[in-house]
């Protein structure tokens, strides 16, 4: 039987980077190549209903005991636009605590001094990059772990819940749940396998919104600008200065939310600012949006109506309110982890997942660990042993479901 590691190494050879500038689904055709390969592999395993729909979503079913609930496992096929996912050259390195040379020519090293959490992996084998690309453990590790768990269930005589498999495109650009067919998926509940270090279990995420601020100025020759020119760029700077410095991402952690300036461009006539707003607490989330609204109103009163145009758009919400009524699904995940000797680490997601959106679409969906770390960059890694244990944990989760 193929191992979770061999699957993972095969999957990362596919370049599946998504593209937020594209309006198609999937956003890049190359994601379909992995989807097609997964369908072929699922059919070969005996998952007879495996298919990819017109939007690049992959579905399949491992039938189980009809007296047990129907449980979904979901992962995403795309990798982040932040770093190249083409021609990934993954390698397995025994880790003894010493610096790991990723690329001798570029003098790139994965060092415990830079990433202290590496200390917990001494004695394990780490899958790393050659320093020129990301690895793709986010989330091809999740895909490999789900596929390997499905294969194990198909070869097991032990009673287990029916498993519904879902692989999504475009999660990294926030669209993974957009066209997910919850009704066709027909699971009682599900888990995304898209988390980090082994043991992480997440059922809280940010409430999220985007904001666009457009500042309108008046250009005139600077030689005759006195009492006439209105510089939109300076108004944009004034708007930014009215937001609390302590609520920037670089100053926050845990349950602390933030207002993050993600982009800006401008001239004397027009300037624009782009923000993302995040907070786990709905009241604080609304306060952040109200603060931006108040700043825009103040500047319009100061410089004249229409000087500042603010557009706010909610993106997703904290899944906690949808998980709390069914907390037994979190307890089942904890029990499966403990059964495999994994200590559950419940942490808030400082971001979002497909599961957050799916929870509001009627499919409660906490997030489980993959084992990986340093996602979206050249220092991404994942321990072999942790992938193997997580695969066993997923099997236990399906077998122990009641």
Locate predicted features.
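Short beta-strand
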Residues: 49-54, 262-265, 347-348
């Amino acid at each position: 039987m193929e191992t979770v590691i061999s699957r993972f190494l095969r999957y990362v050879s596919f370049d599946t980077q998504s593209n937020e500038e594209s309006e198609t689904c999937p956003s890049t055709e190359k994601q379909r190549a992995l989807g097609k390969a997964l369908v072929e592999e699922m059919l070969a395993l005996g998952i007879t209903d495996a298919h990819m729909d017109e939007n690049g979503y992959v579905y399949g079913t491992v039938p189980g005991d009809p007296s047990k609930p129907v449980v979904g496992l979901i992962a995403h096929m795309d990798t982040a636009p932040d770093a190249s996912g083409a021609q990934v050259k993954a390698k397995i390195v025994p880790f003894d605590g010493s610096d790991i040379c990723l690329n001798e020519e570029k003098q790139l090293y994965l060092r415990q001094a830079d990433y202290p959490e590496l200390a917990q992996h001494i004695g394990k084998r780490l899958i790393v990059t050659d320093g020129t690309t990301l690895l793709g453990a986010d989330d091809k590790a999740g895909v490999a772990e789900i596929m390997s768990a499905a294969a194990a269930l198909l070869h097991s005589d032990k009673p287990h819940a029916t498993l519904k498999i879902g692989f999504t495109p475009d999660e990294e650009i926030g669209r993974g749940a957009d066209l997910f067919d919850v009704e066709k998926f027909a699971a009682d509940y599900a888990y995304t396998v898209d988390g980090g270090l082994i043991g992480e279990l997440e059922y809280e995420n940010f409430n999220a919104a985007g904001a666009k601020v457009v500042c309108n100025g008046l250009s005139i020759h600077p030689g005759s600008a006195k009492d006439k020119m209105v510089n939109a760029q300076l108004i944009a700077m004034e708007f930014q200065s009215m937001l609390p410095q302590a609520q920037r991402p670089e100053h926050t952690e845990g349950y602390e939310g933030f207002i993050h300036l993600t982009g800006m461009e401008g001239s004397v006539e027009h300037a624009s600012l782009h923000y993302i707003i995040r907070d786990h607490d709905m009241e604080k989330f609304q306060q952040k949006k109200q603060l931006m609204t108040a700043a825009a109103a103040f500047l319009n009163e100061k410089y004249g109506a229409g000087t500042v145009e603010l557009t706010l758009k909610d993106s997703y919400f904290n899944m906690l309110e949808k998980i709390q009524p069914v907390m037994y699904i979190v307890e089942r995940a904890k029990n499966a982890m403990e059964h495999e000797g994994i200590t559950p680490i419940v942490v808030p997601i400082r971001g979002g997942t497909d599961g957050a959106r799916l929870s509001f679409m009627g499919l409660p969906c906490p997030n489980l660990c993959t084992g990986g770390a340093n996602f979206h960059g050249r220092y991404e890694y994942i321990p072999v042993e942790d992938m193997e244990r997580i695969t066993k944990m997923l099997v236990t989760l399906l077998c122990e479901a009641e």
